[in-house]
Amino acid sequence: MAKKVEKLVKLQIPAGKATPAPPVGPALGQAGINIMGFTKEFNARTADQAGMIIPVVISVYEDKSFDFITKTPPAAVLLKKAAGVEKGSGTPNTTKVATVTRAQVQEIAETKMPDLNAANIEAAMRMIEGTARSMGFTVTD
């Protein structure tokens, strides 16, 4: 019989840099799971994506065992990396801080496709373009 999920914990952790310190430790400690076991496994799985923030969904079962699913990095993080900026605009409709090309948007959409609720790559690109515009980025051909 399948184990019963007791709790779902969602976190965003830098790839390969999970430590028992906050925010990871307290979130997992409340769920009652082995923090060191999680951090070692997470760091091993995400070592190749250094520098990215990786969303992770941890399923905690009744017997305090766990498993986790890593997602693709947030679109905003990928856009900032593609544009080479530290942060988006504070006033995106008046102040544009960077420019991304449609080719970069397509590359990001292809990366994000497994996690997006989009039927095809064009729909995924429109979602990424919307995120870019809301961050004060200009999308060019």
UniProtKB/Swiss-Prot annotation:
The keyword ATP-binding does not apply. GO terms for biological process: translation. This is Large ribosomal subunit protein uL11. One or more lysine residues are methylated. Belongs to the universal ribosomal protein uL11 family. GO terms for cellular component: cytosolic large ribosomal subunit. One of its GO terms (molecular function) is structural constituent of ribosome. Part of the ribosomal stalk of the 50S ribosomal subunit. Interacts with L10 and the large rRNA to form the base of the stalk. L10 forms an elongated spine to which L12 dimers bind in a sequential fashion forming a multimeric L10(L12)X complex. The keyword Ribonucleoprotein applies. InterPro entries: Ribosomal_uL11, Ribosomal_uL11_bac-typ, Ribosomal_uL11_C, Ribosomal_uL11_C_sf, Ribosomal_uL11_CS, Ribosomal_uL11_N, Ribosomal_uL11_N_sf. Keywords: Methylation, Ribonucleoprotein, Ribosomal protein, RNA-binding, rRNA-binding. Forms part of the ribosomal stalk which helps the ribosome interact with GTP-bound translation factors. It holds the Pfam family Ribosomal_L11_N. It comes from the Bacteria.
